[in-house]
Regions:
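Catalytic cores of carbohydrate-active enzymes across secretory and cytosolic contexts
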Residues: 1-473
Length: 473
């Protein structure tokens, strides 16, 4: 039986007792089924030459390493998060490309390949995750690794007009073709990748999703990531903590709109605040009868763009409360702090509306978690951005354009006044999708498809030596 090797930028600690997110839950499920290794950065800076830190529990080994301060800055802070993250979320205006950062990104991917190489066994299958590791398969191939290597991109893949603006776009595209299987959250992401590729070289496609470019053959497929709906329902049900129970009692005559997102410019938080203001302005009958709570814990607080959005939200919250607030009623609560995941699921359950309106998002698991946390007999309503990957599955949500504040305000009004029968029907349809496409289904489909790939060999390469030339200008 093939062993599974998972490679990601960060690894979940083996002693993590709870609060695991989508990637960790899916990866651990796959590793428990096949046995294997989870390899990644420890999250700490230090001496890169130190031996790998290894912990084994059952049939899973965790292997982690430190990064030097310089590599952490170049690979993680600069290229991954100041170039790839904004570009892949359609924010070229925030891209800060620096050649030394690109060189550091490549250097760290090569370093990781060197560290992983001695741990790879002949029949291992390798599953690589996310934008930090786009060149990783290429580095392994240079070192003679012919194992099956799959890649899953958790964030959006931008259109060619965006992606090809990145100075190393051609190198990144060719490196991605060294994976055997490329997985994306949505069909739009998959097609955007192929469009970018076709703009740089001739791509031969056979059997729909099998392709050859630069003499390398690979497959593309869509694997929308899921959640653990049963676990979330369990966390959401049951008695409330004392303070939350008191708050719910105090707000029994107030309808609650609730959002929780990482503080990130891709999440559309300023636009969300303005849409809520439009609701209060356009539908004054709701004033004094609703409350919008936005939880947005700080993320990458050292980056200027994130500092700017935090200050903007603080200013907007104060302005909206000053304009519309009344004695005994504060319309908007903005909390820039972290809350326990289990507590959030309980808050979801007593919320009347879940407001999830990112400007661009690979999937957005918060939307799925909100649905899973609801009481099926009296569910809340999900208002969801058309630019979240989840909108492709949760079609019974109220789908909105987050750039149109009046559209979002109208959807909020509809959600607040929706009859119970319609709420139950919409929730049941979304929950059915979430249960069918849960986190285990996601990892099982990917691993199954990766196992079906024929491992690389000289014979396979000879079959792929077809005419794939760079396109002429």
């Amino acid at each position: 039986m093939s062993r599974l090797v998972v490679v990601s930028n960060r690894i979940a600690p083996p002693d993590n007792k709870g609060g695991a997110g989508g990637l960790a839950v899916g990866v651990l499920g796959a590793l428990k089924a096949a046995g294997g290794l989870w390899f990644g950065w420890s999250g700490e800076t230090g001496n890169e030459d130190e031996p790998l830190k290894k912990v084994t529990k059952g049939n899973i080994t965790w292997a982690s390493f430190n990064l030097s301060e310089q590599d952490y800055e170049d690979y993680y802070c600069q290229f991954s998060n100041a170039v790839l993250w904004p570009a892949f979320h359609y924010r070229l205006d925030l891209v800060q490309f620096q050649r030394p950062a690109w060189e550091g990104y490549m250097r760290v991917n090569a370093l990781l390949a060197d560290k992983l190489l001695p741990l790879i066994k002949e029949n291992d299958i390798i599953w690589v995750h996310d934008y930090h590791l786009l060149p990783f398969a290429s580095e392994l191939r240079k070192r003679g690794v012919n194992n099956r290597i799959g890649f899953f991109l958790h964030i959006p893949f931008p259109t060619p007009e965006i992606f090809n603006a990145l100075p190393p776009h051609d190198e990144l595209l060719e490196q991605l073709c060294d994976f055997d299987l490329l997985g994306f959250q949505t069909e739009n992401d998959r097609l955007a990748f192929l469009d970018s590729l076709s703009s740089q070289t001739r791509v031969t496609t056979r059997s729909g999703k099998q392709h050859i470019a630069w003499g390398k053959d690979f497959q593309t497929e869509v694997y929308p990531i899921g959640i653990e709906p049963d676990e979330i329902a369990l966390q959401a049900a049951g008695p409330l903590p004392t303070k939350l129970a008191q708050l719910k009692a105090e707000l029994k005559n107030v309808k609650n709109i609730f959002s929780v997102e990482r503080l990130d410019y891709s999440k559309g938080l300023p636009e969300r605040f303005l849409a809520y203001e439009a609701l209060l302005e356009n539908y004054p009958q709701h004033r004094g009868k609703i409350r919008y709570t936005q939880i947005a814990p700080t993320s990458r607080g050292e980056v200027q763009a994130y500092q700017d959005i935090r200050h903007q939200l603080e200013t907007e919250a104060g302005r909206i409360n000053g304009k519309y607030g009344q004695l005994g009623w504060t319309p908007l609560y903005y909390l820039n702090q972290h809350f326990d995941r289990k507590l959030l699921m309980k808050i979801f359950r007593y919320s009347d509306v879940g407001l999830v309106t990112p400007l661009r998002d690979g999937m957005n698991l918060v939307a799925k978690e909100f649905v899973a946390a609801q009481d099926p007999a009296n569910p809340g309503v999900l208002v969801l951005s058309q630019f979240a990957g989840a909108a492709n599955e949760l079609t019974s949500a109220l789908i909105v354009n987050p750039y149109d504040r009046d559209d979002v305000a109208a959807a909020l009004n509809r959600a607040l006044t929706m009859p119970l029968a319609e709420r139950i029907s919409r929730h049941a349809e979304m929950l059915d999708v979430i249960v069918k496409n849960d986190i285990n289904r996601w990892q099982e489909r990917f691993i199954h498809d990766l196992k079906e790939v024929t491992p690389r060999s000289p014979e396979r390469q000879q079959q792929n030596n077809v005419a794939t030339f760079p396109k002429l200008a």
